[in-house]
Amino acid sequence: MEKKLYPFKFIPVASRRPWGGSALVKELRKNFVECDEEGNETVLGDDVLIGESWELADMGIEDSVVANGWLAGNTISELMETYLERIVGEDVYNHYGRQFPLLIKFLDINDKLSVQVHPDDEVAAERYDSLGKAEIWYVMDAKPGAKMYCGFNREVSAQEFYDRCHAGTVDEVLNVIEPRKGDVIFITPGTVHAADGGLLIAEIQESSDMTFRLYDWGREFDPQTARPLHLEEAIDIIDYRPFDQTQFRKGPAWGSEE
């Protein structure tokens, strides 16, 4: 008799980021363990800058591992390989195949998140043999002064955006949102976005890590913090129109405010 599947719990995986903080450990009580090449385990404390907790990921690297039940120790990739449509349903399986189609994370944004953009499915498939990356952010907590940058506050040209990235003035044309707990924002492929300080986010996205970093708030000029930029590679996939405000839904913390 075939064993019955059950609700799975997965072991979270920490991702260190220069803009991260300690909220994932302190507030969400995450227990992160890292292993070195020799198999030695280290528990990450709240002194480590952790920007992301990968809760459910089928990415080929750092795949989520089942923590409970008789399938404990198996990865989500192995579950999909074995149980196919029993995991996601026949329609979803027929469309996406053996890769679990969602990547679910928690984000602790304690400093400036780079200005970035993601490709759509068509561009990602043609250029990188990958899914694109549409994502939804749910604001679990927002400290006073926290900001999200989503799209532009007016239409800009590709040349103006390119020049502003090099001049360090890109924030002048970004649409600014002062988020509150419970807000939801849909970040479509092509939407330039970033965030700054004091945000705890639940992120649900397509199963892709296709991120093009466009501007990194000056970190690129410091050898200690420099990360690769992809401005030339991504300049033609950006949506340069003003941000569509219907992509942002205010949460209950706004009350009756307009």
Describe each region flagged by the PLM.
Residues 1-156, 216-257:
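Transition-metal
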Residues 115-118, 178-197, 204-206:
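Conserved metal-binding segment of the jelly-roll/cupin
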Residues 123-124, 145-150, 156-161, 187-188, ...:
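Short, well-ordered, mixed-charge alpha-helical segments that flank or form enzyme active sites
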Residues 135-137, 194-219:
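A short hydrophobic beta-strand segment most commonly corresponding to one strand
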Residues 156-186:
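Active-site glycine-rich loop that binds ribose-phosphate moieties when present
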Residues 174, 190-191, 257-258:
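Generic recognition of flexible, low-complexity loop/linker segments
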